[in-house]
Swiss-Prot record:
Keyword presence, Transit peptide: no
Domain of life: Eukaryota
High-level lineage: Eukaryota, Metazoa, Chordata, Craniata, Vertebrata
Assembly description: Interacts with AURKA. Interacts with importin-alpha; leading to inactivate TPX2. Interacts with HNRNPU; this interaction recruits HNRNPU to spindle microtubules (MTs). Interacts with BCL2L10. Interacts with KIF11.
Protein's name according to its UniProt entry: Targeting protein for Xklp2
Gene that produces this protein: TPX2
Length: 747
């Protein structure tokens, strides 16, 4: 670590003025030397005219070791406040005293810096380059501010600007050499210097305050409103002009220019002069007050975005397409989801809600190693290592137990041990199927006649019915007479029950006989053959092909069909005319029609008349007085009953106390009866159990006696059978005959 610290160096400015060094014993006389020097420099700069002597009059300081007070910002490198304050001073004042004094002080410090023997780091070299650029930029700004009238009156041409820019590097080179020599002589004081990043004058921008920014925004809004009004007026004129009137088309700009907006403009801080002065406050009185609002969080860097020179109206894929969630699913998720008020808050959220203790971030000057988070992102290794795999294989080998078989003696005898070869079976000989159905099909085909019988036509005499009456034309149906009905216009939707008149009688089904066959052809009945179901291969393809062929064949036959030849009928006999009699229809008789409304009206009038008569009769009956029969005379008169009082009550005039029964006594009696019944039941159960026990004991005794009897061996007596009677045989005795083995006597 010691080597690292020796090689590492950080040129950071100090954020404070070390006034402790001014209180040394040797510097007691020169306490105000720094302030005097600053005043002298300002007087010299004010006394001189032009910008030529601005940087020439560099007076050495009274004491080389004197601590220089350099006003620096809070941030070490990227300090926006210093830039803003410097730019405001350059714009407002012609000659900024603070800038000149700081430059001279830096120049004086850089002269006395000795050459550094250590190797310059990349960071130091970059910082020094920035310092040199900033110095040159400040010089240019001072020149511009010193002569504002000349710059406004006479603007240099492009060629002059280019020539001036070409000369600048030469001056910069000489300035770089001087500063490098001066910086090398004072390594200690270089640490106290402030490095400010420089920007080229072309890219330099004047920062505006928040009020100016708000004014600009309001101006832009007003301009947009004016443009919108103009467009609306044009549209109004176009609408009023109509379709036929020629209207001047407004030229719309294709490219839409958008101003550059930097995030750093919104981070402008107030000038220290404009800030409120420090006020002494009583500490104890401020304890109970509410804390101030949390410190303002610093915004990040400006995010670079592409320039939208022309905006399209087409919506993107993300805007149009969104995952569809049905309403039922949303309702189900809502019921399943626990509300946030029931969740416990984490401690991290509470920490974030608390206000930060330190508003000003502390800058650490010591080098620190970066806190890399990659080691925490390492995932757990899921695959097994070789050592684990070998250990698992070893466990499997140990678990497996090998059991040896007996030695086969044939191995020692010699010769290969081969399994017995199975006997080779002969190949299967195919045998054709002799099906009965094939036989029947062959027999049927042989029975079928190859050619149909030749049919000859023989004419027959003409039937006489044709001459007598019309043949083949059906009789005309006699339609029923139309019955007129009153139209019920007011009762269209009323459904009426069908009346008997409306119900049509079901006509009997006419059984038609089959047509008479042709008498010229002799009738030969065909006896249906006794057939069985034929098993045919099931295939849609063959059936469809066959149907298609039949269809094509039928179409061809219809197309090639010959035109039918005309054949005249024989002439009838004109001697006698046998025409059918002409049927004369009866004339339609006019009948008066009866409307439904008339019938309903008559019925209603009749019912209304009956109701009126009934009401009048009831009113007359109510008006006539009719007395009810007198039943009081026949009833018995009312006789009050005398109250029966006891003798004691009558004498003393007091009531005798009747006997009473307490509910406790009644319950006690009921309880005694219940206990008595329970005792009887218990005694009965005990008696039954005792009887069952005695019966079981008797059964066991009987079983033991039976077993003892069966176990004792007792011989069975000799059985007596019926005597056997021997009868003599009736057959004669066998006569012995010698066998004839010789073949001499055979013929």
């Amino acid at each position: 670590m010691s080597q690292v610290k020796s090689s590492y160096s950080y040129d950071a400015p100090s954020d404070f003025i070390n006034f402790s060094s001014l209180d040394d014993e040797g510097d007691t006389q020169n306490i105000d030397s720094w302030f005097e020097e600053k005043a002298n420099l300002e007087n010299k700069l004010l006394g001189k005219n032009g910008t030529g002597g601005l940087f020439q009059g560099k007076t050495p300081l009274r004491k080389a070791n004197l601590q220089q007070a350099i006003v620096t910002p809070l941030k070490p490198v990227d300090n926006t406040y210093y830039k803003e304050a410097e730019k405001e001073n350059l714009v407002e004042q012609s000659i900024p005293s603070n800038a000149c004094s700081s430059l001279e002080v830096e120049a004086a410090i850089s002269r006395k810096t000795p050459a550094q023997p250590q190797r310059r780091s990349l960071r130091l070299s970059a910082q020094k380059d920035l310092e040199q650029k900033e110095k040159h930029h400040v010089k240019m700004k001072a020149k511009r501010c010193a002569t504002p009238v000349i710059i406004d009156e006479i603007l240099p041409s492009k060629k002059m600007k280019v020539s001036n820019n070409k000369k600048k590097p030469e001056e910069e080179g000489s300035a770089h050499q001087d500063t490098a020599e001066k910086n090398a002589s004072s390594p200690e004081k270089a640490k106290g210097r402030h490095t400010v990043p420089c920007m080229p004058p072309a890219k330099q921008k004047f920062l505006k305050s928040t009020e100016e920014q708000e004014l600009e925004k309001s101006m832009k809004m007003q301009q947009e409103v004016v443009e919108m009004r103009k467009k609306n007026e044009e549209f109004k004129k176009l609408a009023l002009a109509g379709i036929g009137q020629p209207v001047k088309k407004s030229v719309s700009q294709v490219t839409k220019s958008v101003d550059f907006h930097f995030r750093t403009d919104e981070r402008i801080k107030q000038h220290p002069k404009n800030q409120e002065e420090y006020k002494e406050v009583n500490f104890t009185s401020e304890l109970r007050k509410h804390p101030s609002s949390p410190a303002r969080v610093t915004k990040g860097c400006t995010i670079v975005k592409p320039f939208n020179l022309s905006q399209g109206k087409k919506r993107t894929f993300d805007e149009t397409v969104s995952t569809y969630v049905p309403l039922a699913q949303q309702v189900e998720d809502f019921h399943k989801r626990t509300p946030n008020r029931y969740h416990l808050r984490s401690k991290k959220d509470d920490i974030n809600l608390l206000p930060s203790k330190s508003s000003v971030t502390k800058i650490c000057r010591d080098p620190q190693t970066p806190v890399l988070q990659t080691k925490h992102r390492a995932r757990a290794v899921t695959c097994k290592s070789t050592a684990e795999l070998e250990a698992e294989e070893l466990e499997k080998l140990q678990q497996y137990k090998f059991k040896a078989r007996e030695l086969d003696p044939r191995i020692l005898e010699g010769g290969p041990i081969l399994p017995k070869k199975p006997p080779v079976k002969p190949p299967t000989e195919p045998i054709g199927f002799d099906l009965e159905i094939e036989k029947r099909i062959q027999e049927r085909e042989s029975k079928k006649k190859t050619e149909d019988e030749h049919f000859e036509f023989h004419s027959r005499p003409c039937p006489t019915k044709i001459l007598e009456d019309v043949v083949g034309v059906p009789e005309k149906k006699v339609l029923p007479i139309t019955v007129p009905k009153s139209p019920a216009f007011a009762l269209k939707n009323r459904i009426r029950m069908p009346t008997k008149e409306d119900e049509e009688e079901d006509e009997p089904v006419v059984i038609k006989a089959q047509p008479v066959p042709h008498y010229g052809v002799p009738f030969k009945p065909q006896i249906p053959e006794a057939r069985t179901v034929e098993i045919c291969p099931f295939s849609f393809d063959s059936r469809d092909k066959e149907r298609q062929l039949q269809k094509e064949k039928k179409i061809k036959e219809l197309q090639k069909g010959e035109v039918p030849k005309f054949k005249a009928l024989p002439l009838p006999h004109f001697d006698t005319i046998n025409l059918p009699e002409k049927k004369v229809k009866n004339v339609t008789q006019i009948e008066p029609f009866c409307l439904e409304t008339d019938r309903r009206g008559a019925l209603k009038a009749q019912t209304w008349k009956h109701q009126l008569e009934e009401e009048l009769r009831q009113q007359k009956e109510a008006a006539c007085f009719k007395a009810r029969p007198n039943t009081v005379i026949s009833q018995e008169p009312f006789v009050p009953k005398k109250e029966k009082k006891s003798v004691a009550e009558g004498l003393s005039g007091s009531l005798v106390q009747e006997p009473f029964q307490l509910a406790t006594e009644k319950r006690a009696k009921e309880r005694q009866e219940l206990e008595k019944r329970m005792a009887e039941v218990e005694a009965q159960k005990a008696q039954q159990l005792e009887e069952a026990r005695l019966q079981e004991e008797e059964q066991k005794k009987e079983e033991l006696a039976r077993l003892r009897r069966e176990l004792v061996h007792k011989a069975n007596p000799i059985r007596k059978y019926q005597g056997l009677e021997i009868k003599s045989s009736d057959q004669p005795l066998t006569v012995p005959v010698s066998p004839k083995f010789s073949t001499r006597f055979h013929c």
